[in-house]
């Protein structure tokens, strides 16, 4: 099963990917993680990516796609994979389709986790992180016993820059600008299924599994 997970920041893609990994025993491929690994291991494409990164430039699509191809060739992807964070644009989706075609494979499902912006803002801006041990809390959904203090180590809790409202609004704006055409792209290929990302982790997981097994 070859699966793409789409969804805005804070929608719970990472959580759902971890649950799907356990259930289907296929790897999650996060572009950020494999890019860093390819650079560290100095794979052919990792070496190319490093030259762009060292120059402070964005790594071009063809290099990112090449790194994904290197990853898909590894044995643990033989029964499928979950792509998280890629593709983000129609051009990337086209490039991915060509790579998969060359491997004799194709995407089976594209799951879009849908959550409205105000819900996402509440989820993300309420996050707090311990400066000392890194444990996460949420002011509404998982508050610490004492305000601003970590339950585990009594460290100070703070709000990461990425979790601030102005930053999150910008991230959402960029996401929707990039991804709206991608949603249409996969809808036109009859691959896209949308799942409401509201409810417990288990409830959302069950909705996704129902689609995958349907």
UniProtKB/Swiss-Prot annotation:
Pathway: Purine metabolism; AMP biosynthesis via salvage pathway; AMP from ADP: step 1/1. It is an enzyme of class 2 (transferase). It holds the Pfam family ADK_lid. It is found in: Cytoplasm. It catalyses: AMP + ATP = 2 ADP. One of its GO terms (molecular function) is ATP binding. The keyword Acetylation does not apply. GO terms for biological process: AMP salvage. ATP binds at residues 10-15, 127, 199. Zn(2+) binds at residues 130, 133, 150, 153. The keyword Acetylation does not apply. Residues 30-59 are annotated as: NMP. AMP binds at residues 31, 36, 57-59, 85-88, 92, 160, 171. HAMAP family: Adenylate_kinase_Adk (MF_00235). Consists of three domains, a large central CORE domain and two small peripheral domains, NMPbind and LID, which undergo movements during catalysis. The LID domain closes over the site of phosphoryl transfer upon ATP binding. Assembling and dissambling the active center during each catalytic cycle provides an effective means to prevent ATP hydrolysis. Some bacteria have evolved a zinc-coordinating structure that stabilizes the LID domain. Catalyzes the reversible transfer of the terminal phosphate group between ATP and AMP. Plays an important role in cellular energy homeostasis and in adenine nucleotide metabolism. NCBIfam families: adk, PRK00279.1-2, PRK00279.1-3, PRK14527.1. This is Adenylate kinase. It comes from Geotalea daltonii (strain DSM 22248 / JCM 15807 / FRC-32) (Geobacter daltonii). The lineage of its organism: Bacteria, Pseudomonadati, Thermodesulfobacteriota, Desulfuromonadia, Geobacterales.
């Amino acid at each position: 099963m070859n699966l793409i997970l789409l969804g805005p920041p804070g929608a719970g893609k990472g959580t759902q990917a971890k649950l799907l990994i356990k259930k289907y025993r296929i790897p999650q491929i996060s572009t950020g993680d494999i890019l860093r690994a390819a650079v560290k291991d100095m794979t052919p494409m990792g070496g190319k990516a490093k030259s762009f990164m060292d120059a402070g430039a964005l790594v071009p699509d063809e290099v990112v796609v090449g790194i994904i191809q290197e990853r898909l060739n590894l044995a643990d992807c033989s029964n499928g994979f979950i792509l998280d964070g890629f593709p983000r644009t129609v051009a990337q989706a086209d490039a991915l389709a060509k790579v998969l075609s060359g491997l004799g494979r194709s995407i089976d499902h594209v799951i879009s986790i849908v959550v409205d912006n105000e819900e996402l803002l509440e989820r993300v801006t309420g996050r707090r992180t311990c400066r000392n041990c890194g444990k996460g809390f949420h002011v509404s959904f998982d508050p610490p016993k004492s305000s601003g203090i970590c339950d585990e180590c009594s460290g100070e809790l703070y709000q990461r820059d990425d979790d601030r409202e102005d930053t999150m609004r910008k991230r959402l704006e960029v996401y929707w600008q990039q991804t709206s055409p991608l949603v249409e792209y996969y809808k036109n290929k009859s691959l896209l299924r949308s799942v409401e990302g509201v409810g417990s982790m288990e409830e959302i997981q069950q909705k996704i599994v129902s689609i995958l097994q349907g």
